[in-house]
Amino acid sequence: MRLYSGAILCTIATLLISVSTASKTTGSHLSTRLPLPIDKPENNSLPRFLRVSTQNTENGENRVISAGLEKLTDLAKAGVSNINLGSWISKDPPAEPILRRFKLTNGMDDALASPNLKALENYVKELNTQNNNNKASVIGMFMAHYGDDAVANALMTAQRAGGEMNTIQRLRNAQLLSWLQKRKSVDDVFTLLKLRSDGYLALASPKMEVLDDYIKLVISTKSTKDSLLKTLTKGFGGKEQLATILARAREDVKTRELALALQSALINKWVRVDLLRPKHIYKKLRLNRGLDALLDRNVHTFGAFISMYNAKNPNSKASLIDSFVAQYGNKAVATALTFAKPDDAATMNLVITLQRQQFLKWKEGGISANSVFRLLDIHFNDLLSPTNPKFDTLSGYLATLSNKNLLYNEGMLRAVSKGFGGEDELAIQTARAREHLIRNGYADLDEISIATEYQRMLFGRWFKRKTKPSDIYGTTFRSSENTASNLERATAARYKDYYKEHMAPPRIDTSINPRR
């Protein structure tokens, strides 16, 4: 599976045939970097580029170069037919001044779209006809001036955009063959293309397809085990680093398809070739560094590994959550997941997945809702705020226990009441929390606090049982109005107001609206 938006350059056979033809035009024996006029040998004397002058000064040399290049440009535009260039130009032409004279130094994209490109090809063709030694090449000049990566990127981009296909493909072929003739390894080309500096976006770069084409060319010409996965693994610094790159690339629509394919290939190698086990990958991906690793992108990679590992080993009971719980413990993991605040949807989905796995493990282990209440360490202070993720976690586990979403007022009230020690204790704690908020100047929070919410839920249950306000002391607090505590009296007073409000007959709108 490939992400590339363009077709593969061509088959290797076509490539070899076309390049043998293209070499007559572009030449492919030029060294990676052509010497420029400022390059001085050790004896500090500049090389002669033009034979029409024998001056020894630097200024004279440059004047000769300029004059020769002007003549060169005119001849190239005229077709350079039947002209003996060997009489006035050297066998080692500099890339910079030549490209400048042909006005091809304003960027590789502009150069490919310029009509002067054809003139340059004509010049190089005639030059190579007269020069039987070190042949010049258009692609060599471009790579010397712009760099291998910029040239490769521009050529592939132009091909995808439907540029002059004959010229573009000829130059692409020439670049690949140039690397091959210089014995560049696929790792060398990865470096030349500067893919590592692109990070995960390298997977969406046109240069990635160039690298893939070169790998196929190398495989076709010699026995090798090179592959895109192997090259990227080494290029990005190892399997762990590549896994991190791929985990990030999965989140971007531009790179997701190729990232998933490469990730699958990498995991398949771990499982079927390297025979690694979950504990090895857990450490390899550095998920053992601390609880913050729960939100690491590589958790996705680890989860994919476990799925493939379990498929290959049916007796395996490895799970994502078990690895974290084994190291950090149930409480620490549950707390970390409860208070996690992901910045993106992908990480939020990861937290939800891990929580669900933990809930299922608790259910399989017979863990009660009351045990989870204690595990989450829910206490008085948790009633003071408008929201608290501990209650969300408890609610999520209750839903798992029932295999459906319980009505919040039923399942949660029962679980929280039991957690606090019964309805009477929950009533006292909610009353205490409300008084605490009012006494400390947070009356505005009182009406929206968790304490107020659960107090009203208790009142709703008592009203449904047809419990009268006068009966609260005996049925709930097992006391009397005379012996009740201040918090019990405050609760009874509030329930009395609630009872009256709900016992009052509904108001009937007696207003008469005249017809219009």
From Swiss-Prot:
Induction description: Expression is induced during host plant infection.
UniProt key word Membrane: yes
Nucleotide-binding as UniProt keyword: no
Signal peptide: 1-22
A cellular component term, taken from the record's GO annotations: host cell plasma membrane
Sequence motif RxLR-dEER, residues: 48-63
Protein family membership: Belongs to the RxLR effector family.
Domain writeup: The RxLR-dEER motif acts to carry the protein into the host cell cytoplasm through binding to cell surface phosphatidylinositol-3-phosphate.
Name assigned to this protein: RxLR effector protein PITG_15127
Upper lineage: Eukaryota, Sar, Stramenopiles, Oomycota, Peronosporales
